[in-house]
C-alpha cells in the first residue's frame, strides 16, 4: 500500500497577515499537514506569520521555507524554529534555500559558494537543534554557542533545483522541496538525483514540491486563474530543462520580454492551455486529479498547493486532493 500523501499549502507573503487565520482554518479543516511560509524579501516575514498560523490551529504544521543563509544567519533560523517548536511542540519544520537571485541582487547580496554555504547551514542548524554546545569551524560559517531552549530535533529541509543542490538534499537534509511550475517529468528527474545523495549518505529523505493548482467546472476558467502566476515562474531561464523534459513549447525570452513590457495579452498568448496543463494540476476536478496522481507517481510524499489563496477556490482544490484516494493524511 502506498504511503500516505500529505497535503501542504504555500503562503508567499503577498496577502495581508490578517488573512492567515482564515487560511489556516481552511487548510486545517481540509486535512492539510502543513503551511509552507515562504521567506521572500520585501514580503510578510515568515517567522511572525508562522506564529499566527500555529496559534490558529491545534494540528496544522508550519514550515519556514526557504530561509536563505545569505540574508538570515543559520543560527538565527535555528533560534526561530526552536522557539516556535517550544511554543508549538512537534509542529515546526525548517527549510533552507539560496533565495531568489533577483531578490538577493536587490539588497546587494551575492550568493557565493551556494552548495558549501547550504551544506554548512544544514550542519550548523542540526547541531544547534541537538541542544548541545556547538563549535563549528567551516569555510563559510564559524559558530561557538548553544541554544538556550535546549534540544528541538525538528526536520531540516532544503529547497533545491540544480543537480548539486539536489544531491546535497539527499545526502544531508531531512527533506527536499522543489519549486513551483515544475512538471512531473522534471520532478522525477530531480528525485533521481536526490536518491544518489541518499545512497551516499545512507539515508532516506522526504520529498515535496510546490504544485500550481486550480479547479473549476470550466477547464479554461481554471487555467485563467493560474496562467499569469505560472508564466511569471516559467519565464526564468533556469526552467529550460523543466520545459524540455515536459515536452513544453514556450518562448521564454519572448515571455520575459512581455512581462518586462507589462504586455499581458502577449503573456497570456504565450502561456497556452497546453503549457498550463503540463505544469499545473489545473482543470476540472477529474483533470486536476489526474495531474495530482502524476505528481505523486513521480515520487512525492507531499504536494504543496501553490497559487491558490482565495478561500472558496482553495476549498475546491483541497476537496479535489482529499478525494484522490483514502491515503491522504497528516
Regions found by a protein language model. Give the residues of each.
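Active-site-adjacent structural elements that line small-molecule/cofactor binding pockets in enzymes
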Residues: 1-330
